[in-house]
């Protein structure tokens, strides 16, 4: 009970401590309590860090720029004020980041695989999310979710995660929005061209879900969020599935795509 209370307080303070590159869901609605069972909270003694996604009973996938010292993970969370009976807390046993990632570039290979110190089991509010069998096509409708701000300019955080539908866009849209950024095949460009819906501060590391499959990881975006023609950039999970599966199988020297 003490741990649950501490987590609730940390989540309430998430805005004050969220890193600048974090993102949150703007323009969405309250998620159904059972549609985000794979969503994971990463936090430490200072507060909320990022989101993550449960892909295996022992493994969570998040963004590499979410890496921090001494963090924990909470699973099965919906309301920050009313804990679910099946919420679980885990520590990281091992963390894996692409060995060829550019250390001075948070946008490069923004993916991290975390092994839990103990497995978790499916429950009413905890479930795995499937890795993709194929990449999403331009125009696909996908779901984003998180406890991030629900305002593009003000720090207004909901008590429960919000969800929104956005579209996979052509890389040219993101190249135009982020001058100096070279879109790569290992990223996805996703959002709403007319604006109004977006991931934003606080949602970093969370999932982009298309047709029930885990297609993207929240990585990069504009602030304020939700501006027209300024979509978000997501790590393309499909291109890392071989690396992910190799690590889980025990090949810790596996290489990421270039």
Curated annotation (Swiss-Prot):
Tell me the organism: Lachesis muta muta
Q: Which UniProt keywords apply?
A: Disulfide bond, Fibrinolytic toxin, Glycoprotein, Hemostasis impairing toxin, Hydrolase, Hypotensive agent, Plasminogen activation, Protease, Secreted, Serine protease, Signal, Toxin
Tell me one GO molecular function of this protein: toxin activity
Its EC number is 3.4.21.-
Q: In the UniProt entry, which residues are flagged as the active site?
A: 65, 110, 204
What Pfam families does this protein's entry cite?
Trypsin (PF00089)
**Entries under PROSITE patterns matching the protein:** TRYPSIN_DOM, TRYPSIN_HIS, TRYPSIN_SER
Single GO biological process annotation from the record: proteolysis
- State the signal peptide span: 1-18
Spell out the CDD domains in the cross-references: Tryp_SPc (cd00190)
Quaternary form? Monomer.
- Taken from the UniProt record, the cysteine pairs bridged by disulfide bonds within this chain are 50-66, 142-210, 174-189, 200-225
Q: Which domain of life is it from?
A: Eukaryota
PTM note: N-glycosylated. PubMed:17034951 shows that it contains approximately 10% carbohydrates, PubMed:10871053 shows that it contains approximately 20% carbohydrates.
Q: Give the protein's recorded name.
A: Venom plasminogen activator LV-PA
Q: What class of enzyme is it?
A: hydrolase
Q: Which residues are glycosylated?
A: 44
Give the function comment from the record.
Snake venom serine protease that activates plasminogen. Weakly hydrolyzes the alpha chain of human fibrinogen without releasing fibrinopeptide A. Does not hydrolyze plasma kallikrein or factor Xa. Does not clot fibrinogen. Does not affect platelet function. Induces hypotensive effects on rats. Shows a preferential cleavage at Lys-|-Xaa over Arg-|-Xaa bonds.
Q: Give the record's GO CC terms.
A: extracellular region; secretory granule
Annotated Peptidase S1 domain residues? 25-249
Q: What is its main location?
A: secreted
